[in-house]
């Protein structure tokens, strides 16, 4: 399989790959690209550009796209469940349930975003503002790095990617290198314009450090303790 950067299926610029192993059989399922710092730079650059266009779409348009995404997931849910079972090692019943959660979570975030209103502050609430009506609106952060742990990859994908997209952000998806295949298949959706928004990079610990230089929001800083400490130390040093 290949990574997806700027809506295109690509290999690593280094040409390096690593194997995804079935934990039950010890056999290789698939080989995936091993991302380099240069690959991440390309993904970040494309995400910044794509986010500006994505942010121009209305909340209802974004919701429609996510609902179409769910329809395609439903059409391929058994294939996705079998992939998740093979690469993750969880029983097929649990894999099917986790894939089924996509059709619950994505619509839920899509519909919630439609009612995520701004705030109106009446006149006189603050001293000196007796005649001023203040309106607080919500704006996208920009690019969100969605770091996905190995244990519930699809559930965490739902909880990070769906709200990020619905609020007008771009999302760079960084799956666990133990089991990236299901998320790569989810992201490889050629029928949707969503491909310009989500980017797939095969995860290694240093990828987190590289991304932290650029992105202003992390979906999860607990993927690896030393990476979390590195991010904190960097923030502390300005």
Language-model segment annotations:
Residues 1-131:
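N-terminal Rossmann-like NAD(P)+-binding subdomain of aldehyde/semialdehyde dehydrogenases
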